Curated annotation (Swiss-Prot):
Organism: Arabidopsis thaliana (Mouse-ear cress)
The protein, known as: Heptahelical transmembrane protein 1
Tissue: Expressed in roots, hypocotyls, vasculature of cotyledons and leaves, hydathodes and guard cells. In reproductive organs, expressed in trichomes, veins of sepals, stamens and stigmata of pistils.
Function: May act as a negative regulator of abscisic acid (ABA)-mediated osmotic stress signaling and function in cross-talk between cold and osmotic signaling.
Induction (record text): By abscisic acid (ABA), salt, osmotic and drought stresses.
Main location, first listed in the record: membrane
């Protein structure tokens, strides 16, 4: 109690270095009205807790479920409300570019899809074997898989800071999105190349779809979401991509005389290079491994991986357009 009869109390304040100090918090101005003073103190503490929840953290302050990359040292969000996580899309933290690279990619692919729907309305033409009447559904399956992957990735990176339960769930959806994108990428080339021999496109598409389902089931095992299985996850995705070597070799033999063969092959090789290089950054965690803390918000491996995934998808889109144009003019 001070000389004016006010009640002063000691309040414990947490310090960043783990030590705690006490400071004097003046009592109320109502002659010892404990109820009013207590309410103000509770309100102040609530506001402090709210602000603390929205503060960016360092790696060592994170809960265990969010510790994924020890070379990114700062600017983390953790245990944020859904509302705060949503509005963090407009702030600058270490997930900002992860969100925006694939969110912009999703919007771009939506625009491409709408443009193609407006330009071509023949999803299931009556005579798919006649030139100019080629079915479009395999092409739109690829676009749908790409959009799902990009959107799932953006949502995962935006809301994974909410809770452990949501984090695990969104990681699974993210893995499912990557798998879906790989599976659906096979649909346009395999379908249009082997359209005149349906048994082959059925065999190849059934094969990659089965591999994808197995991959999703495997990755839905909670323990495989841990950082130590990063290389294993990448290996699963790479094995799905390498499956394409078999139908690609078959396609080269079947369409050796196709004048668009070389251009299409270049686009597909570019896609493979983009995906492999991006995966290399993702697994190696370069460049942040070389300079921890330097690339926390801009330029770390996952952001680079996202850019290469988007470039690979666009390269494959260009190849798919060539396949469509070829079948539109050639037919069976």
């Amino acid at each position: 109690m001070d000389q004016n009869g006010h009640n002063d109390e000691a309040e414990t304040v947490s310090c960043g270095n783990g030590n705690c100090k006490s400071k004097i918090v003046p009592g109320d101005d109502h002659g010892g009205d404990e109820s009013s003073g207590t309410k103000r103190r509770k309100k102040r503490k609530t506001q402090q807790k709210t602000m603390k929840r929205r503060e960016l953290m360092s790696y060592c302050e994170l809960p265990e479920y969010m510790k994924d990359n020890e070379y990114i040292l700062n600017y983390y969000r953790a245990d944020w409300s859904i509302r705060d996580a949503f509005f963090s899309v407009f702030s600058f933290h270490n997930e900002s570019l992860n969100v925006w690279t694939h969110l912009i990619g999703f919007i771009f692919f939506v625009a491409l899809t709408v443009a193609n729907i407006i330009h071509h309305d023949g999803f299931f033409p009556v005579d798919a074997k006649s030139p100019g009447n080629v079915t479009r559904w395999p092409f739109f399956v690829f676009l749908g898989g790409s959009m799902f992957c990009l959107l799932a990735s953006s949502i995962c990176h935006l809301f994974c800071c909410h809770s452990k339960e949501l984090n695990v769930f969104l990681l699974r959806i993210d893995y499912a999105g990557i798998t879906a994108m790989i599976i659906t990428s096979f649909f346009p080339p395999i379908f249009y190349i082997f359209q005149c021999t349906p048994r082959w496109y059925f065999i190849y598409l059934a094969g990659i779809t089965s591999m994808g389902i197995f991959t999703i089931i495997t990755l839905f095992t909670p323990s495989l979401s841990a950082p130590k299985y990063r290389a294993f996850r990448a290996l699963l995705f790479a094995s799905m991509g390498l499956f394409g070597i078999v139908p690609a070799a078959h396609a080269l033999v079947v369409n050796w005389g196709n004048p668009q063969r070389n251009v299409t092959l270049v686009y597909e090789l570019l896609m493979a290079v983009f995906y492999l290089v991006g995966t290399g950054f993702y697994v190696g965690r370069v460049p942040e491994r070389l300079k921890p803390g330097w690339f926390d918000r801009v330029g770390h491996s996952h952001q680079i991986f996202h850019v290469f995934v988007l470039l690979g998808a666009l390269s494959h889109y260009a190849a798919a357009l060539l396949f469509l144009d070829w079948r539109d003019h050639v037919g069976c």
